[in-house]
Each structure stands twice: as C-alpha cells, then as structure tokens.
Amino acid sequence: MMEGITIIVLEEILMANGLTVLMMWFLLFCRRKNRESLHVGDKIYDGIAIVNLVGALSETIAFLVDGKQFTGSRQINYISNSICFIGTVSMGMLWCMYVELRIYRNYKRMVQKAGVEIFPWLVEVIMVLCNLFGTGIMFKISGENVYQRTAGVLVGYISLVIYFAYSIYLVYHSKKQGVNLNFFPVIYFVGPCFAGVVLQFLFYGITSSWVLVAVALIF
C-alpha cells in the first residue's frame, strides 16, 4: 500500500486544473499563430503542452467521479487515472527529447537517444496497462469506486526524477564538450516540475504538478 497524506479540496482541484487548461490552450494558440511552419523541436514542445492539458482534464474527471456510483463510473475512474500516470511520464520523456534536440540540433541523434530514453516510459505504460486488469500494481479502485494508490506509483516518480536529472546532465555535459548554447535555463523547467511532483507524491489530493508544468512551459 502506498498512501501519503490525503488532502482533497475539489474547488482547489477545479481551479488549478482549469487554470492549467487555459494556460496550455493560450500557449498552443499563440505558438501556432506566430509560426508559419513548425520544426520538430516545436512539435515536441507543443506535445508536452498537449499532454499536460490532457493530464489536467483527466485528473479533474478522476476526482469528480471518485466515490460516485453510476453506470461506467468505475471504468471512467480507471481510465482517467491511467491517462494521468502515462501522461506524467510521457512529459518527462518528451522533455529529454526536446533538450537533446535543442542542444545538438541533430534529429538523427535524438532518435537514437530516444531508443534508450523510452525505456522508463515503456515500463510505466506496461504497468499501467496491467493495472487495468485489476492487478493493483499502480492503484486500486474499490467496489465503492474509491481510488487508492499502491506501491507501484513509485516507479513513475522515480522515472520522472531520472528524466529530469538526465536533462540537467545533458545541458552541463554539452557545455563541457564545448557546445555553444544560447540562454537555455533547463532548471527553470525542471525546478517547478520537480516541486509539483514531490508535493503531489506526499499529499494526495493536492493537484500541483500540472499547473506548475504549465507555468514552467510558459515562462
């Protein structure tokens, strides 16, 4: 069993995730409006924003249906929480791909590195898919349709930490190699994202990760 301190305030969840959706929609709208064509790096960055938007919506649905009893409510709870888990680790992988491409500007190199970077993502996805069959590896949904995290959630958090740490390593290692980088404060993204992940791990019901990712992407 894996449970932190539970603090669920539905109004706070709706406000934070609603703000996330608005910020991501605004970001995507502005980026598309100001560009005649999108490069691979732009598409990856937009992909992070889209995943964050979908994650915020899925989490909101998960909290709204949790504990409710109606036809299909348990299935919705399973699916929405599964999307949240996959979305979280997907952002970590996409961020590493973006950093790799931003530093070396080599699409072929990024694809080659992605073959290794995708491993934590695959582990998480396989675990989430297995969880849909009621194994309880990542989380459980009781007969009363109440969500409960289990020990497997640690895999997702560890994967994110690995992705964040690797992106920082890429930047500082490239500088040692003499790669001339323009202003690229990787910590400005990793810092808020890491803080949000830690808060959400320790205090279930505080929805901080999506909105902090949104802030990091915009600023």
What are these regions (language model features)?
Residues M2-G4, R35-G41, F70, R109-G115, ...:
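Hydrophobic, membrane-facing alpha-helical anchors
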Residues G4-L10, Q75-G87, E144-Y157:
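Short aromatic-rich membrane-water interface segments that cap or initiate transmembrane helices
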Residues M24-R31, L94-Y98, Y157-G178:
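Alpha-helical transmembrane segments in multipass membrane proteins, preferentially the mid-helix core
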Residues L14-M97, E117-G134, V186-F201:
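Hydrophobic alpha-helical transmembrane segments of multi-pass membrane proteins
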Residues E36, L64-T71, I103-R109, L132-E144, ...:
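Transmembrane helix-loop junctions in multipass membrane proteins, especially transporters and channels
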Residues Y169, S174-F219:
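Interfacial "cap-and-anchor" motif at the non-cytosolic start of specific transmembrane alpha-helices
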Residues V89-M97, R102-V161:
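Membrane-proximal helix-loop-helix units in multi-pass membrane proteins
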Residues M2-W25, G152:
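Hydrophobic transmembrane alpha-helical segments in integral membrane proteins
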